[in-house]
Design a protein with these regions (language model features):
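A short acidic/basic microdomain associated with nuclease active sites
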Residues: 52-66
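Domain-level recognition of nuclease-like catalytic cores that cleave nucleotide substrates
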Residues: 3-13, 120-162
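Catalytic cores of nucleic-acid endonucleases
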Residues: 88-142
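Short acidic/glycine-enriched loop/turn segments that link adjacent beta-strands
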Residues: 66-68, 142
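A generic alpha-helix signature
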Residues: 37, 41-45, 104, 108
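Interdomain/boundary linker segments immediately adjacent to catalytic/signaling cores
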Residues: 1-42
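Conserved catalytic cores of phosphodiester-cleaving nucleases, focusing on short active-site segments
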Residues: 46, 50, 71-94, 109
Length: 162
């Protein structure tokens, strides 16, 4: 009887442990620092906002193996491949969120977009127009507000070279 009670206690402990781990895995966001949580919430809001506007989202948080950083959202709008840099805030500051996309960030996004383009069939690459947009997401108590800057910065050359 005592060994049966020990087994029952062990089973209950394992079930609690498994439940705790599964819950933490399902809601990893609770473990994130506030600024990363805001970023993920902003990217999620941007995803649904852009889908509602008719964009076809083909990648989220896309990473290249040899280029630092990621592409927040990649979408098709007609025949244009749009790379979205999402900037999320919980308050509106004097400086817009989009102001953080400086020349270094633009260079990084161009390199990542070039790496992403290599995934497309080679025959189609020259005809793909790439556009870099910035989407600022303000996560306010009254709901999310969006500021979209289409074609925020140009490609370096006209042949899909960044």
């Amino acid at each position: 009887v005592e060994s049966l009670m020990n087994l029952s206690s062990l089973t209950l402990t394992l079930e609690r442990s498994l439940y705790t781990r599964l819950r933490a895995r399902a809601d990893r966001r609770s473990l994130l620092p506030p600024h990363l949580l805001t970023g993920q919430r902003g990217e999620d809001a941007a995803f649904f906002h852009l889908r509602a506007l008719g964009y076809t989202i083909v990648a989220r948080r896309w990473h290249a193996s040899r280029v630092r950083g990621d592409l927040d959202l990649v979408a098709w709008s007609g025949t244009t491949l749009v790379v979205f840099e999402v900037k999320a805030r919980t308050v509106r500051d004097l400086a817009p969120a989009a102001a953080e996309v400086d020349h270094l960030k633009q260079h990084q996004l161009r390199k990542l977009a070039s790496a992403y383009l290599q995934r497309l069939p080679e025959a189609h690459r020259p005809s793909v127009r790439i556009q870099f947009d910035i989407l600022s997401v303000y996560l306010l108590p009254t709901g999310a507000e969006f500021e979209h800057i289409p074609d925020a910065f140009p490609q370096v050359a006209s042949t899909n070279r960044f």
